[in-house]
């Protein structure tokens, strides 16, 4: 990839505009989860160290374009950054017609989604943003799959467009996992529906040595194998699709293993009583919420021998502890594996946090939709823009 990296540039005295993903949960004016902010700090600090006048922009939530709404203000993010950075940080509400930015300070632009034309990648808006800087830095992998004014258009018109350390790190890790992986390459895809992950499953089934499915997705594969799934969440209209994917895997010398034992309950609730059953013994009034110990041990063995592991989605309803043992065992197996491992997606990161394996996963992706689209083999608009500007 012919992408310019921010780390390679002389930024002394330059006006540097960094697009970060600072879309964090806020409650009563306080940031309640700072993972994305912590991920963005190294890039902001590097620009400061290089002597730049630093401007930062991001979206937060889904406000109505053209309307200021304090609920979606980046003020809580500015408050956080003020404590995290040893320099002045201020919020600029009106910046499109010019903003004063000095070397050694950070100016955070108010929510880019307050600007009319942001989501539609309006060219006039993109040009206004580009006119504010000498160097545009795209560092928000979490929004790299969206062609919007602040993630794509601005980069086409800025004097220089480059990737920040976070984005560059994401692309390097994903490239290592998908483009030239140490084999065997094992992918775990969980989640509730086959339909939302169908293109991911399709794409991965052609390149991985072993595809593992979990969650509601696995229920559809269990049904496709001819087993009763009771009242479990599954997609009857995609059973043929599941059979085809399984056949594809077998034609490549692999398979998509169906659980041999499952954990069921009669209701979906935090207090539901969990019962362990063989996969062929699920009754009509039961729901499958996790894989059983035999199945999780079999998967752990697969992971033990992997060269590369890509994890997207839990294998059970791990939010309830009685249905979390499968995901917990998978997490432990990934932590113990010598394979290069990459985890991505909101539920996956929640599981990584819950089971305390963050420092044992080789790379944790900050992208949700962007992570999935990369796995699907789709071109990410922001990355394509950076490649075009790097030539």
UniProtKB/Swiss-Prot annotation:
InterPro entries given in the database record: Phosphoglycerate_kinase, Phosphoglycerate_kinase_CS, Phosphoglycerate_kinase_N, Phosphoglycerate_kinase_sf
Amino-acid positions noted as binding substrate in the UniProt annotation, renumbered to this chain: 21-23, 36, 59-62, 113, 146
Catalytic activity: (2R)-3-phosphoglycerate + ATP = (2R)-3-phospho-glyceroyl phosphate + ADP
First-level EC class: transferase
Gene Ontology CC, one term: cytosol
Location(s), subcellular: Cytoplasm
UniProt xrefs under Gene3D superfamilies: Phosphoglycerate kinase, N-terminal domain (3.40.50.1260)
The EC number(s) this enzyme carries: 2.7.2.3
Signal sequence extent: none
Pathway: Carbohydrate degradation; glycolysis; pyruvate from D-glyceraldehyde 3-phosphate: step 2/5
Primary subcellular site in the record, as a coarse category: cytoplasm
Pfam families xrefs: PGK
GO MF, one example: ATP binding
Keywords, alphabetical: ATP-binding, Cytoplasm, Glycolysis, Kinase, Nucleotide-binding, Transferase
Transmembrane segment boundaries: none
Protein residues bound to ATP: 197, 319, 345-348
Example GO biological process: glycolytic process
Stated family: Belongs to the phosphoglycerate kinase family.
Assembly with partners or alone: Monomer.
Listed name of the protein: Phosphoglycerate kinase
Organism whose genome encodes this protein: Shewanella woodyi (strain ATCC 51908 / MS32)
Gene: pgk
